Regions:
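Helix-breaking motifs and short loop linkers at transmembrane-helix boundaries and internal kinks
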Residues: 56, 88, 109-115, 126, ...
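Helix-to-loop junctions at the C-terminal end of transmembrane segments
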Residues: 76-89, 302-315, 400
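A late C-terminal transmembrane helix in Major Facilitator Superfamily
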Residues: 162, 368-404
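Glycine-rich segments within core transmembrane alpha-helices of 12-TM secondary carriers
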Residues: 149-173, 194-195, 382-392
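Conserved MFS/SLC helix-loop-helix module at the cytosolic interface between two early adjacent transmembrane helices
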Residues: 75-114
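Cytoplasmic helix-loop-helix junction between adjacent transmembrane helices
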Residues: 119-156
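C-terminal transmembrane helical hairpin of 12-TM major facilitator-type secondary transporters
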Residues: 314-364
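Extracytoplasmic gate region of multi-pass secondary transporters
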Residues: 44-45, 244-303, 358
């Protein structure tokens, strides 16, 4: 017994060392990649008013263009991640970053509503698969116990993108007139090229798997592979079998729909917050960016606090439920408020909840999938959420184009209520999934196998 305990302690120490190496080597570049994704998403919100003035894009057309990014992203999400599974995360994340960076720079050539739609659609197609590819990379390198923390760190990059992207975009827009370009053209050009630079570092620094990492010993790579394994499912040896199972498992569908409701609200806020701030008589692109960045700071706090609460409660589904319910009174309060400061604070509170909860969605999913099925399942969840990213800005822009603020508020309140109504379904399907996994574990154990005989 003592020898077994000593061996286990040695394995735990080896895993801790290998995990620290992986975190130190991989998380900075993965976070930087995700940071740039949200800087590039924030910039179109910063450019909204300028695009309307300089190019003649209407509020309704802006809503369509902002959302159409998510439509093409959603259409290509699953194919993108199945390719990623074949070629490896390193090659595919690099490809994604290069193409989305170049197309982000191409936003500077937008001349009318049609070209706005086309570039936004292509931009979504280029970026399709980024987030599930990052999540899949996490499942390869980190154990289930570590993943909620690692995903939380990635979401800190999202918050940093929100918090710093708007002021950065505002600062670049102050270059208005330099070289004969509008300020928004400078913003898209510079931020797109920065993304291409980040892609180079992904190619150089991110191995596909632990055994490919020159900075790990063979024993360290082996222990990372061993601890990263989570329970699988029947049919994981075939592509068709995994896709069918991932799409048919009820807990995946329930989680996907709640994530959809979350994204309707959060993306509508993300793409319209700078113009909301401007409508509250805040002047100057940089100052508008600074005030808009408050939503990123609130999101940062949420990503720190909500996973911390989950670690204390040790029940991610329960915490997910509480936070989802809390979004309803915040959305209602925003819809009836009229003070500028209060409205900004309520938007910040909404983003704290909506973004802070995101690591829990992925923790619930990753605990119950592995291998190719994880690649397909995570992509499916993200795809459904991306459809929410299309619906939210589209409905909000449609309401704004008709001069109806109350209809825009109804989008946020309705999405919050939808998430709450779906919670009982999630609870039921997760319990069913866990019972199924427990039964499979019993059958796979020596005692279970003996009983089966």
């Amino acid at each position: 017994v003592n020898q077994q305990r000593t061996a286990q302690d040695g394995t735990d120490a080896l895993h801790a060392t290998a995990s620290r190496k992986a975190a130190f080597r991989l998380l900075p570049i993965l976070c930087l990649t995700y940071f740039m994704a949200f800087v590039d998403r924030t910039n179109v919100g910063m450019a909204k008013t300028s695009l309307e003035a300089d190019v003649g894009i209407s509020a309704a057309a802006y809503g369509v263009g902002a959302g159409i990014f998510f439509l093409s992203y959603a259409l290509l999400e699953v194919p993108s991640n199945l390719i990623m599974y074949r070629v490896g995360p390193r090659r595919w994340i690099t490809r994604i970053a290069v193409t989305w960076g170049l197309l982000c720079s191409c936003m500077m050539f937008v001349q009318d509503e049609l070209s706005f739609y086309v570039v936004r659609f292509l931009l979504g197609a280029a970026e399709a698969g980024l987030y599930p590819a990052l999540m899949y990379t996490v499942t390869i390198w980190f154990s289930q116990k570590q993943r909620v923390t690692v995903v939380g760190i990635l979401y800190l990059a999202v918050c940093a993108g929100f918090a710093l992207g708007a002021p950065l975009g505002g600062a670049l827009m102050e270059l208005h007139g330099a070289g004969g370009l509008y300020g928004w053209q400078w913003m898209f050009l510079v931020e797109g090229l920065l993304t291409v630079v980040v892609a180079y570092f992904v190619w150089r620094l991110v191995p596909d798997r632990p055994e490919d990492a020159p900075w790990l010993t063979a024993r360290e790579a082996a222990v990372l592979n061993d601890r990263a394994v989570v329970r699988s499912a029947p049919g994981h040896g075939t592509l068709k079998g995994n896709v069918r199972i991932a799409f048919a498992r009820p807990f995946i569908l329930a989680l996907s729909l709640i994530y959809f409701a979350n994204q309707v609200s959060s993306v509508a806020i993300q793409y319209n917050f700078p113009s909301i701030v401007e409508s509250l008589d805040v002047e100057g692109a940089f100052l508008i960016g600074v005030v808009s960045g408050s939503a990123g700071i609130a999101s940062f706090i949420g990503v720190l606090v909500i996973p911390w609460i989950q670690r204390r409660v040790r029940n991610e589904v329960r915490v997910l439920t509480y936070v989802t319910v809390a979004t309803v009174p915040v959305a209602i309060a925003y819809s009836v408020s009229d003070g500028a400061v209060l409205r900004i604070l309520l938007i910040d509170a909404a983003m704290l909840l909506l973004v802070g909860i995101l690591p829990l969605y992925w923790s619930v999913a990753m605990a119950r999938m592995s291998g190719l099925m994880a690649a397909a399942g995570l992509a499916f969840i993200n795809t459904v959420g991306l459809l929410g990213g299309f619906v939210g800005p589209y409905l909000y822009g449609l309401a704004e184009g008709r001069g109806s603020e109350s209809a825009g508020y109804a989008v946020l309140v309705g999405a919050a209520l939808l998430g709450v109504l779906l919670l009982p379904v999630l609870h039921r399907t997760v319990r069913s999934e866990d019972r199924r996994a427990g039964q499979e574990a019993d059958v796979g154990s020596p005692a279970g196998a003996e009983g089966a005989r």
